[in-house]
Amino acid sequence: FAPVSEYEAAFAMGVNVTVANVELLRQWPAIFRGRTVWLRIDLGHGDGHHAKVNTGGKEAKFGLSAQRVEEFMDAARDLGMRITGLHAHLGSGIETTAHWKLVVDELAGFARRIGTVEVLDIGGGLPIAYSADDEPFDLDAWAEGLAQIKAVHPAFRLAIEPGRFLVAESGVLLARATQVVEKDGVHRVGLDAGMNALIRPALYDAWHDIVNLARLDHDFDTDFDVVGPICESSDIFGNRVKLPADTAPGDAMVIADAGAYGFSMANTYNLRALPAEDLLDEGVSE
């Protein structure tokens, strides 16, 4: 659903372009005539840690329906196009290692029908353990499954998009406690950062561990709702977070695993400033 001008710009820069519907070809044939592209297919199912990150199936806006692949092939053939890659990303935070093996198998079937496909891009979605209750992703089992299915379909190279898995645990959000308040039995600690700095909890009900750095030697035995200063009921970083009972204004707080979909989704809503970004290289801030 990008503006067609962005497709033109991408082709001009030699960028690998992935197309996800046949309407593009019919409405702007001059832009796509003779082009080499990849095709994103909706395999009819999706997965993920939240409904808002499930990117497959009828309710998702992504990808060409598998029922229309032949239609796309006909339109591409009429324009002298070449399809060299197939893509399917069906969600984020998928815990079943066999998921990607299934995607390879399904895409390979379409690739053989098309006849010119060289690469199968099986998307990303590899999860991390955001809390102690989460099982670590079995990367060895994931790799073994891909090796097995690659042996079944040796004609195709595989592409993977492991962004979150690589960077989520590499970043944190640092903030200070501003107020500590009790209301009707609920204890809340406010921070000088809000959902504008890390929107995942508000948007996806996502859990991020939160630690009071100022009182690491104290017992983390009291439930607090950790909130921000923004005028939204969803401006909450976590409910019933275990923190020291004597948590106080001025305490330094860290919200873990903010390296993915953190600053990249930050904004200035409610006139709140963007957080500063510091890069630590061997312990030195840059």
Positions of PLM-derived features:
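Active-site-proximal beta-alpha core segment in soluble small-molecule metabolic enzymes
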Residues: 1-119, 128, 134, 145
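Conserved beta-strand positions
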Residues: 19, 88, 122-124, 160-162, ...
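Contiguous, function-dense segments enriched for cysteine-driven chemistry
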Residues: 116, 133-149, 153-162, 172, ...
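Charged (often Lys/Glu-rich) extended helix/loop segments that serve as interaction or gating elements
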Residues: 156-286
